[in-house]
Regions:
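Catalytic machinery of carbohydrate-active enzymes
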Residues: 1-365
Length: 365
């Protein structure tokens, strides 16, 4: 059976108070479905924090991926149901057993992938809230009985906040996060920070190789940072691409103080990011993790629009060639094309120059 992990939960059957939106009266038993990936889970966590800030007695259940759970597992007052997509039909059956006999006041369908849509059928809810028509893909609309308000050219995080809007949760001026780690991991991070001194994190690997910057340019940037008096460390996950990317950078013999690739848990990585002066990364999870702990990020982009997927609080600090790549490939500016359209090509990141990155570094440090 799927492991069901509980945070400390406040139980309540009372109803939400009235709000001035069109759906002013709903119940407080809420389930959200966002399985992956790390960056998107960071965005979803901001929405959860918003709900908890204004409705602290809400009963929240989060259906989440096995790996992603490791990042948010200590969030208070949330019941997590782990959905291991590698189990296929068995994962759906386990989810069904985990929510057996329950009816939620609202199910927030925050993932449009068909796998998530199909799995959502076993969750009983009075309101099944999905994305608006423009953002509905893979038959997403078939599984919802209500849609969030339409929105143009929004960041993924703002799109997730639309679900809180649909519930009537009061808006926030800026998002915030509450993603705790253990005292042991906090101490570990403090020890590493003390040993490293003033350091910058390079998280070089995205989930696809085409989104990665050139190893020699990462190496050149590490040397540039070292000349500015900064220690530089590499971080990444245990996957082959992460390790291969780190090794390619190290082969260039840059000034790297430590390589943490594949050597940290997600919580240890989060603490390393928290104590850093700056993070340099392509479109990858650690960039968004750094945002949750208020560390400045320089994002490197070519394939996706940083206005949509960039580090939320550091969009202006991205170095992006997305605009020119899209216009060259499509013959139109991205504003004239469907929102979220990606540029294609294995070598697009070659357009991101070290001079442009150095300029951002100088502005931030």
């Amino acid at each position: 059976m799927t492991p069901v992990t509980y945070g400390k939960i406040y139980h309540s059957n009372e109803l939400f108070r009235h709000f001035s939106n069109e759906r002013a009266f709903v119940g407080k038993k809420i389930c959200l479905m966002r399985l992956s990936a790390i960056g998107d889970v960071c965005h979803a966590a901001a929405m959860v924090t918003r709900i908890q800030t204004h409705w602290p007695d809400a009963e929240l259940t989060w259906v989440i991926g096995k790996v992603e759970y490791q990042l948010v597992k200590l969030m208070p007052n949330v019941r997590f149901i782990i959905f291991d997509k590698k189990q296929g039909k068995a994962a759906v059956e386990s989810l069904k057993n985990a929510v057996k006999g329950e009816t939620f006041d609202a199910l927030l369908m925050m993932q449009v992938a068909l796998r998530a849509n199909m799995a959502s059928r076993v969750i009983k809810a009075k309101r099944r809230i999905g994305f608006d028509w423009a953002r509905s893909k893979e038959l997403h609309w078939l599984f919802a009985n209500e849609r969030v308000a339409p929105r143009q050219h929004s960041h993924v995080l703002d799109g997730f906040m639309d679900f809180a809007d649909a519930l009537g949760v009061p808006k926030v001026a800026t998002p915030s996060w509450n993603i705790p780690v253990s005292e042991e991991d906090e101490r570990w991070g403090e020890e590493q920070a003390a040993a490293l001194g003033d350091y910058v994190v390079i998280a070089p690997a995205a989930s696809k190789a085409e989104r990665n910057w050139l190893p020699e340019r990462y190496a050149e940037t590490a040397d540039y940072l070292s000349q500015q008096g900064k220690s530089v460390i590499l971080v990444g996950g245990p996957g082959d691409l992460d390790k291969t990317t780190a090794n390619a950078i190290l082969a260039c013999k840059p000034t790297i103080k430590a390589d943490f690739t594949g050597k940290t848990s997600l919580h240890q990585l989060l603490v390393l990011l928290k104590h850093a002066s700056l993070v340099l990364a392509p479109d990858t999870g650690p960039a968004h993790m750094a945002t949750t702990v208020s560390t400045p990020v320089i994002g490197l982009y070519a394939h996706s629009n940083p206005i949509r997927t960039g580090p939320y609080n550091n969009i202006d600090n991205t170095v992006s060639v997305y605009d020119e790549c899209i216009e060259k490939q499509k013959g139109k500016k991205w504003e004239q094309l469907p929102w979220g359209i990606r540029a294609k090509g294995d070598n697009l990141m070659e357009g991101v120059t070290t001079d442009a990155v150095f300029s951002k570094i100088n502005a931030l440090l």
